[in-house]
A protein has these predicted regions:
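Flavin-dependent oxidoreductase catalytic cores
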Residues: 1-355
């Protein structure tokens, strides 16, 4: 790709460089889902990124699957996120909020009235969540009915309104990593026989209904979407990822959204776990009217600079944890500070804001 450190415009929003900070769950919010002042410091420290995508943020209590993850579904959340956004903007940074519903990747402990988590179909994930006691197996989910699906679409709309009230520059719809939208998309987890199951068009309906509604709140160019076509994270897969995600990319492109964020390979793991033509996906998105392509997973400066011109933006995740000045380090070829995995989730400033 052309110079990683040049500015890049997504319509009327100009990123000062093409380095994007990936959304990273750090489990440092309050137990009620409110972001903290420490989180504001953390994001401000990383404001030299062209765009920060803030950590996955649940749109409802039902959407939560891990302890101390933030929410965006009440006025306390909005007020606390506003402080975070203000800190990033004070350093001339841009920040996007990733909207999240975990679906079946949850436990009754997190759910309203200790009820079962929800999913397109009642299939339990062979995956883990964590609370104050440590890691737990996910609970058996129940299948959503169509009225409940409409309610969740409406919750995404409210979350988008709340993000706008908190002054986020963009929002990203999290349709990857085996969470609720991904559970609808992929045929291993979606066994429905109604309007939301069966064909690729039906399995994509939930995502596209969400996109169609949130682009009434934010301009389409200020909305991104994250997918992970061949990731098996959270016990998920599809029998024909090429056909499914080409359709998804084209439909998102037709809606002229700001970017398509693609996790290449297995989330946080092997970039080459399964053969897949990502360049074709980026082309399909942009030829249909999408604005920018964003690649993610295991990128280094060398891999980024060698990337094809179909890729506009590169997302870096873990390196940003221990290198708040990652952009400068990449630009001037300075050594990167290694991260301490024991501090990735939970805790206070150690391993969070003290790098």
């Amino acid at each position: 790709m052309k110079n990683l450190f040049e500015s890049f415009s997504i319509k009327d929003l100009t990123l000062k460089n093409k380095v994007v900070m990936a959304p990273l769950t750090r489990s440092r919010a309050k137990l009620d889902g409110s972001p903290t002042d420490l989180m504001a410091t953390y994001y401000q420290q990383r404001s030299s990124a062209g765009l920060i995508i803030a950590e996955a943020t649940q749109i409802s209590q039902q959407g939560q699957g891990y302890i101390a993850t933030p929410g965006i579904y009440n006025s306390s959340h909005v007020a606390a996120w506003q402080k975070v956004v203000d800190q990033v903007h004070a350093k001339d940074g841009l920040i996007c909020l990733q909207l999240w519903h975990v679906g079946r990747i949850s436990h009754t402990d997190f759910q309203p009235n200790q009820s079962a988590p929800v999913a397109p179909s009642a299939i339990q994930a062979k995956s883990k969540v964590y609370n104050d006691k440590g890691f737990l197996d996910t609970s058996m989910p129940r299948a959503l009915d169509e009225n409940e699906i409409a309610d969740i679409v409406a919750q995404y709309v409210e979350a988008a309104k709340n993000a706008k009230q908190a002054n986020f520059d963009m929002i990203e719809i999290h349709a990857a990593n085996g969470y609720l939208i991904d559970q609808f998309l992929r045929d291993r987890t979606n066994k429905r026989s109604d309007n939301y199951g069966g064909s690729i068009e039906n399995r994509s309906r939930f995502l596209l209904e969400i996109i169609d509604r949130v682009i009434e709140i934010y301009p389409a160019a200020r909305v991104g979407c994250r997918i992970a076509p061949v990731s098996t994270f959270n016990d998920i897969s599809d029998s024909n990822p090429k056909e499914l995600f080409t359709y998804v990319a084209e439909e998102l492109g037709k809606r002229n959204i700001g970017y398509l964020h693609v996790i290449e390979g297995d989330t946080g793991g092997d970039r080459n776990n399964q053969a897949f033509d990502y360049l074709n996906l980026y082309r399909a998105f942009k030829e249909a009217g999408g604005l920018a392509s964003m690649a993610n997973n295991g990128y280094t400066k060398e891999l980024a600079e060698a990337a094809q011109d179909e890729i506009d933006l590169i997302c870096f995740g873990r390196p940003f944890i221990s290198n708040p000045d990652l952009v400068e380090k990449l630009k001037y070829n300075l050594p990167l500070t290694p991260g301490d995995e024991s501090t990735f989730y939970g805790g206070g400033e150690h391993g969070y804001t003290d790098y």
